[in-house]
């Protein structure tokens, strides 16, 4: 059994997509990041960066005590190795997947995240920051579009690279992007959206009540942190 400590963010969606695709038994444990639940001492014991998602594998392969993993990319790798799915064993194919997973972790996610912040949430409009991150998001869409030309999925076969990237493309309109400008990306996006496991993952998200996440108090919690 996997305990998934989760909130309805792109990084959270990555893990529900994997778990639904792989058919691993799991339980969602909501962590309301707008209410500060990510600072609970128990959660911090296995997610020291106070971010979701994180998991606890209650039946790890070594037979030991529950194993905690934080950072969505590390979680995807861990689960792929556990399930022996969606991450090839052959080195060339494996690293084709991993380089795109890390591209998402180091590029698409952080840049689109800053896009969201300055376009949607910042208390003041800063034109330079907005333009900077909207343009960089656009550039990254172009990189992904080129990679997808002539193939159904990012690394050829469906993999954790697709699961990592898709949730960050879902809010493309909020990122001020037009999918029609990226035909290969748009075809992949539609292909992903039609997968039954992806549909189920987003249905699970809809069951989590996030109505009060972005209150003024929540924004202070989310965007006003310093070292603890």
What positions do the PLM features span?
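Alpha-helix/helix-capping structural signal
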Residues: 74, 196-197
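GST-like domain detector, emphasizing the conserved glutathione-binding G-site
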Residues: 1-131, 135, 145, 219
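GST-like fold's C-terminal all-alpha helical module
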Residues: 104-196, 203
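Short secondary-structure boundary/hinge segments and terminal tails
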Residues: 36-37, 190, 209-211
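Acidic/histidine-enriched, glycine/proline-rich intrinsically disordered or flexible terminal extensions
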Residues: 205-228
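Short beta-strand edge/turn micro-motifs at domain boundaries
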Residues: 19, 197-198
């Amino acid at each position: 059994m996997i305990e998934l400590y989760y909130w309805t963010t792109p990084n959270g969606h990555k893990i529900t997509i994997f778990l639904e695709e792989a058919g691993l038994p799991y339980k969602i444990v909501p962590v309301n990041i707008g209410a500060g639940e990510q600072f609970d001492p128990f959660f911090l014991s296995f997610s020291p960066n106070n971010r979701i998602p994180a998991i606890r594998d209650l039946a790890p392969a070594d037979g030991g005590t529950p194993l905690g993993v934080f950072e969505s990319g590390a979680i995807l790798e861990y689960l792929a190795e556990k399930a022996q799915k969606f991450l090839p064993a052959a080195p060339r194919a494996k690293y084709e997947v991993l380089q795109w997973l890390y591209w998402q972790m180091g590029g698409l996610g952080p840049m689109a995240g800053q896009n969201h912040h300055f376009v949607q949430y910042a208390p003041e409009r800063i034109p330079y920051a907005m333009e900077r991150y909207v343009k960089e998001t656009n550039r990254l869409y172009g990189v992904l579009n080129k990679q997808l030309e002539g193939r159904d999925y990012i690394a050829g076969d469906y993999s954790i690279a697709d699961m990592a990237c898709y949730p960050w493309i879902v809010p493309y309109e909020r990122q001020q992007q037009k999918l029609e400008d990226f035909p290969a990306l748009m075809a992949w996006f539609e292909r992903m959206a039609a997968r039954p496991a992806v549909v189920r993952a987003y249905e699970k998200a809809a069951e989590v009540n996030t109505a009060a996440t972005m209150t003024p108090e929540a924004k202070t919690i989310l965007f006003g942190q310093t070292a603890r």
